[in-house]
Amino acid sequence: MSAEPRVDPARPPDPKTAQLRAEKNPIKRLGKVLGPGLITGASDDDPSGIGTYAQAGAQFGFATLWVTLVMLPMMTAVQYICAKIGLVSGKGLAGVLREHHPRLLYPAVLALVVANTLNAGADIGAIAAAINLLVPVPAIVFIVPVSLFIIALQVFGSYHLIETVFKWLALALLAYLAAALFARPDVIKVMVGTLVPTIRLDPKYIGILVALLGTTISPYLFFWQASQEVEEQISIGRRHLRQRQGASHFELKYALWDTIAGMVFSEIVAYFIILATGATLFVAGKTDITSATDAAEALRPIAGDAAALLLAIGLIGAGVLAVPVLTGSAAYGVSEAFGWKSGLDTKPGRAPQFYIVIVAATLVGMALNFLGINPITALVLSAVLNGVIAGPLLILVMLVANDRSVLGERVNGRVLNVIGWVTTAVMCLGALGLIVTTLVGLSRSDARPREGVGRASERKEGWTRTPQRRSTEQ
């Protein structure tokens, strides 16, 4: 029996490969390579992730900068494996798991939908709060318009339009590099924090390490990247499964470079957020940062209006990019798990269930901003769900990546297997650490009920914070 996925002889050629081969300018070639990998990497730096990076810098200065270097190969390996599964099988990750490992798929997809919806709601609130930093209008006013804009982009925009918009939104994250320069960090201390790993047996420090790991290697990115590789194939005319199955050496090579570029971009942004907040908030003793908007507000009196403005702009771009990825990956997971037609390049009338999931997840996320739910509690729950399913999902991903009936000769090599399995082990251990630190954190918060209730009752906007009000409280 042949282990190689069958390839349709009528498979349309990939025009991108021919264009890349013909392009001599390395910069233009890189621009043409960038696609799902860049978008995936940029969407990883969503407002919730930015808040985690800001917390790391504010609480521990430069002591966690080294973590970004450690996470880069892990993140790159995992996302490239997911991209390869999509390219070679011609299906999204959930579609492959449905055929080969269905038992764990459905609870994983359920947890994914819940976690993504909570995360999307928090990100919508963060976008509105960031706009409020720029415009003197209550943040709650922007919740509905932002949500409807995101829905319209996904439902009515073509795949190419969405991809183009996402690429430009990714550039907004470069604002964090500029914000770090305004912070004027101590270069020697930065180099030490980057190159010398710091290990502390401090529950808070261990907790932030686990949080950094969990916000970087997230299950929704596994589903998104595999599905986007399939979308790319469909967009060049490979609409039938047999036309998409199999992938040439050059297609995999360019997918690898795209993934590397996206993950490097993601970790550079994370690095500079930690650097900027470490050089300002940590030095000034402002360690009580619970969100990205907190960080932007706190930066203003320390690093000036320009740094705070750049942080707010980056936050808006990150949120508008991340919310569609969160709701879209949930829709891909559900649709592929149940065998429904899916795809952002497919008209809503031909894939109604797919778009219903997108719209429902966005609207529920929007509604959470009006219910007075504590956003930090919701994000903790989202992080726990992601942490719990990441390890088991990675085990399944690694099994598929070594299954010749799925990938043929494109199964993982030794290097990918080593990095992939090490990452899987680390994520499983991280999940245990996340559960422990969450239980400890919740038990401590239960011991101080008045503070939690008071802060929640003061924010009638739900998940949306009004910075001016918060600063007067302080």
Question: Which residues make up each language-model segment?
Answer:
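Membrane-interface "cap" regions at the ends of multi-pass membrane proteins
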Residues: 1-48, 103, 232, 236-239, ...
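Helix-loop-helix module between adjacent transmembrane segments
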Residues: 41, 75-79, 104-123, 128-158, ...
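Loop-to-transmembrane helix boundary motifs in multi-pass membrane proteins
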Residues: 103-105, 140-143, 306, 310, ...
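Transmembrane alpha-helical segments of multi-pass small-molecule transport proteins
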Residues: 106-110, 134-156, 172-181, 350-364, ...
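Flexible loop linkers connecting adjacent transmembrane helices
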Residues: 13-18, 52-55, 80-104, 129, ...
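Extracellular loop-to-transmembrane helix junctions
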Residues: 28, 55-80, 94-99, 103-106, ...
